[in-house]
């Protein structure tokens, strides 16, 4: 079966909004009898895309003609499509029929050796699908040699042509060198594509220049 994964090592509210819009299309127009999963290591983070989807659903079907929402699920009753959350707090992580997974901020996954109970549960839920889609949208974190580090290493090998994997699509937004962070402010757009339009540009500037600079620069 064709399995597709996207690693997007840059996240913002705009990325969450795009993921929610994509899920909304599936909720109303997707194949019936499927589950869509909003996953993260933390339940609060898993809620972000899920709540955005709920807000869009309310605006499109405010009278709940074919859709509904409770504390844990967003459903299309007519087509039997369910959008739910999955996190480390979820007790039962099996028995799903997932067609698409949105894994948000996977840098928080701190399990050793690149393992992730959440990601594995999602893949098990997609095992019966011919073309499941697993989207991993995250910023960089501080957990070394964990799930995200392993995925980024694999992504770079795919990008550089070391590994031939037609089912793995990676978009990595990062600086070319650490030195350019301090020496070329215009280069920040490489790792923060939205910075030229974002209201937090001043905050980024303050954070970077208030941090201790490497002694080698």
Give short role names for the model-derived ranges.
Residues 104-108:
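Walker B catalytic acidic pair
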Residues 9, 41, 139:
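Conserved H-loop
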Residues 2-22:
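Walker A/P-loop
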Residues 34-53:
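Conserved Walker A/P-loop ATP-binding site and its immediately adjacent core
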Residues 115-217:
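Non-catalytic, compositionally simple segments
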Residues 19-31:
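Walker A/P-loop NTP-binding motif
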Residues 13-14, 93, 109-110, 143-144:
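Catalytic P-loop NTPase motifs of RecA-like helicase/translocase cores
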Residues 49-99:
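Inter-Walker segment of RecA-like/P-loop motor cores
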């Amino acid at each position: 079966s064709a399995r597709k994964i996207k690693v997007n090592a840059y996240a913002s509210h705009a990325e969450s909004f795009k993921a929610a819009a994509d899920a909304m299309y599936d909720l109303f127009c997707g194949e019936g009898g499927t589950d869509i999963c909003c996953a993260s290591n933390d339940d609060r983070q898993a809620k972000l895309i899920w709540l955005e989807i709920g807000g869009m659903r309310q605006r499109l079907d405010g009278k709940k003609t074919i859709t509904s929402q409770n504390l844990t699920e967003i459903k299309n009753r007519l087509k039997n499509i369910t959008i739910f959350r999955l996190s480390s707090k979820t007790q039962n992580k099996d028995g799903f029929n997932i067609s698409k997974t949105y894994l948000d901020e996977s840098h928080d996954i701190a399990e050793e050796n690149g393992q992730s109970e959440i990601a594995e549960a999602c893949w098990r839920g997609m095992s019966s699908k011919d073309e499941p889609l697993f989207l991993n949208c995250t910023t960089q974190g501080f957990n070394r040699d964990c799930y995200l580090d392993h995925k980024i290493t694999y992504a770079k090998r795919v990008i550089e042509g070391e590994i031939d994997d037609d089912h793995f699509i990676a978009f990595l937004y990062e600086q070319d060198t650490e030195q350019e962070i301090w020496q070329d402010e215009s280069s920040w757009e490489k790792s923060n594509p939205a910075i030229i339009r974002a209201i937090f540009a001043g905050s980024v500037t303050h954070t970077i220049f208030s941090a201790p600079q490497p002694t080698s620069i």
